[in-house]
């Protein structure tokens, strides 16, 4: 599943790869090819490698976008944590507060506090309400979080 925002971001990346990156790399390959012997042309090899990466990413994104299940999380009017929820929790060991959003695998980005629906923390949070405790096993051991706030 993807949120509307996540789907839009993937579509934008795909548009950029097709409309900007692909033409740029084609031009770079043509430029490198004009420098002569391709067998010892590092510029040409690097451009071909980048082209391969870009084409692979385009294929991957086209597949994801074509079969994406987009969920409008603004329609969630519930006090229960579900896909798309923004959850404020407090670590019961450290009293540190953190806010996470539960998203699909392609949107997950821990630096933006977006956690995958399939992650251990998200699995522990799903179905809980404000005041509940979510427990899961982290690499550093068992973690417990109290749920302070849920929003969509």
Task: Go through each PLM region and give its residues.
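N-terminal cationic and glycine-rich segments that engage phosphates or anionic surfaces
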Residues: 1-15, 19-49, 53-56
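Preference for short coil/turn "hinge" residues that link or interrupt alpha-helices
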Residues: 10, 31, 63-64, 108-110, ...
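Conserved NTP-handling cores and scaffolds of large molecular machines
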Residues: 14, 18-21, 65-69, 129
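Low-complexity, intrinsically disordered basic tails/loops
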Residues: 48, 52-55, 63-71, 77-78
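Non-DNA-binding regulatory cores of transcription-related proteins
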Residues: 71-145, 151
């Amino acid at each position: 599943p993807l949120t509307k925002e996540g789907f839009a971001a993937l579509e934008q990346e795909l548009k950029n790869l097709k409309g900007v990156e692909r033409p740029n790399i084609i031009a770079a390959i043509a430029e490198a090819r004009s420098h002569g012997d391709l067998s010892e042309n590092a510029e040409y090899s690097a451009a071909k490698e980048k082209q391969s990466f870009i084409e692979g990413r385009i294929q991957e994104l086209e597949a994801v976008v074509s079969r994406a299940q987009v969920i409008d999380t603004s329609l969630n009017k519930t006090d229960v944590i579900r896909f798309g929820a923004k959850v404020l929790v407090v670590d019961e060991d450290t009293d540190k507060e953190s806010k996470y959003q539960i998203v699909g695998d392609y949107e997950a980005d821990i630096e933006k506090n977006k956690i995958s629906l399939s992650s251990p923390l998200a699995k522990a949070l799903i179905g809980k309400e404000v005041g509940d405790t979510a427990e899961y096993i982290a690499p550093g051991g068992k973690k417990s979080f109290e749920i302070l706030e849920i929003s969509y």
